[in-house]
Curated annotation (Swiss-Prot):
A biological process term (GO) from this entry: response to cytokinin
Annotated function: Sulfotransferase that utilizes 3'-phospho-5'-adenylyl sulfate (PAPS) as sulfonate donor to specifically catalyze the sulfate conjugation of brassinosteroids, including castasterone (CS), brassinolide (BL), related 24-epimers, and the naturally occurring (22R, 23R)-28-homobrassinosteroids. No activity on phenolic acids, desulfo-glucosinolates, flavonoids, steroids, gibberellic acids, cytokinins, phenylpropanoids, hydroxyjasmonates and coumarins.
Any GO molecular function: brassinosteroid sulfotransferase activity
Protein name: Cytosolic sulfotransferase 10
Organism: Arabidopsis thaliana (Mouse-ear cress)
Active site: 146 (proton acceptor)
Family per record: Belongs to the sulfotransferase 1 family.
Inducing or repressing factors: Down-regulated by trans-zeatin.
Reported tissue expression: Expressed in roots.
Recorded superkingdom: Eukaryota
EC number(s) given by UniProt: 2.8.2.-
GO cellular component, one term: cytoplasm
Lineage: Eukaryota, Viridiplantae, Streptophyta, Embryophyta, Tracheophyta
Protein localization: Cytoplasm
């Protein structure tokens, strides 16, 4: 990726919130989350004020193309890994997996794949999308989102594209959120606890939550339209990475050829995108963005890490809630 292609200053065309947006926000019920921030309930989900400003911008300005790929996830669910894997897959004809100048060796995955509601449409309905697009017109546009499927239905109604959702066990998500918040420059660890995060998740009052409704929106999408929706589990990616990466490639219409498989391309992608390799990239060790150290995106990535932190009472409570919320859906964690 050339320097000019880096996704800098994606919020150049800043627009103030419309009066309609201000009126909407003032009319919504709100709660205080575990960080003391005000979250507003809009059509069943909890959003911060800035995300609420981005939703109408996405509705009016985002025009999906059939070749677009949207990577969706609840935060701290494997987003960074999915971005790296997807970029390496769809760009492997342009960027050799053995190239020392591969973009993933010089840029954080979040720089390469911008977030719709935060990087692009937060302050504008007409962001400059050329800031991150590949110079190859045949390459798909890659976007990410932490929103549920529901607010995306408006732009997707006109032109549906490929959507990949990665879901992670909510107990591991909570622990990961806890540690990630400690890395934020504006957050003091003593200001909140795992117990506070746990209660917010149980009550459903978390940014983009409730967690189960978020996951179910994409789960149902994958059942109704498997051509356009792929539902992936973080735990499956960890347990069977080769199988899952090949599944992802098939879904994205860029399957591995026999020659690629014989030459070890699958393993090369997994190595390039591995937690240990990405963690060792210089920019991921030293760069800070939005008051977050890039290194904080690469902690453990373990499955079942929650067992070291949650009490039996916490586990019983969240398991009962999960069983109730997912009952009859076919979705299991």
């Amino acid at each position: 990726m050339d320097e000019k292609d880096r996704p800098k200053n994606l919020r150049e065309e800043e627009e103030k919130p419309s009066e309609e947006t201000k009126i909407l926000i003032s009319s919504l019920p709100w709660e205080i989350d575990y960080l003391g921030n005000k979250l507003f309930n809009y059509e069943g989900y909890w959003y911060s004020e800035d995300i609420l400003q981005s939703i109408p911008n996405i509705h009016t300005g985002f025009q999906p193309q059939e070749t677009d790929i949207i990577l969706a996830s609840f935060y701290k669910s494997g987003t960074t890994w999915l971005k790296a894997l997807t970029f390496a897959l769809v760009q492997r004809s342009k960027h050799s997996l053995e190239d020392h100048q591969h973009p993933l060796l010089h840029h954080n995955p979040h720089e390469i794949v911008p977030n719709l509601e935060l990087d692009l449409y937060l302050k504008s309905s007409k962001p400059d999308l050329t800031k991150f697009l590949s110079s190859s017109s045949s390459s798909p546009r890659l976007f990410s989102t932490h929103m549920s499927l529901d607010p995306l239905q408006v732009p997707l109604k006109e032109n549906l594209c490929k959507i990949v959702y990665v879901c992670r066990n909510v107990k591991d998500v909570m622990v990961s959120v806890w540690y990630f918040r400690q890395s934020k420059k504006i957050t003091r660890a003593e200001d909140y606890s795992l117990e506070a995060i746990f209660e917010s998740f149980c009550n459903g009052v978390t940014l983009h939550g409730p967690f189960w409704d978020h996951a179910l929106s994409y789960w149902r999408g994958s059942l109704e339209d498997p051509k356009h929706f792929l539902f992936m589990r973080y735990e499956d990616l960890k347990a069977e990475p080769r199988t899952q990466v090949k599944r992802l490639a098939e879904f994205l219409d860029c399957p591995f050829t026999k020659e690629e498989e014989d030459s070890g391309s699958v393993d090369k992608i997994l190595e390039l995108c591995s937690l240990s390799n990405l963690r060792s990239v210089e920019i991921n060790k030293t760069r800070t963005s939005s008051r977050v150290d890039f290194k904080s995106y690469f902690r453990k990535g373990q499955v079942g890490d929650w067992k070291s932190y949650m009490t039996p009472e916490m586990v019983d409570k969240i398991d009962m809630i999960i069983e109730e919320k997912l009952k009859g859906s076919g979705l299991k964690f």
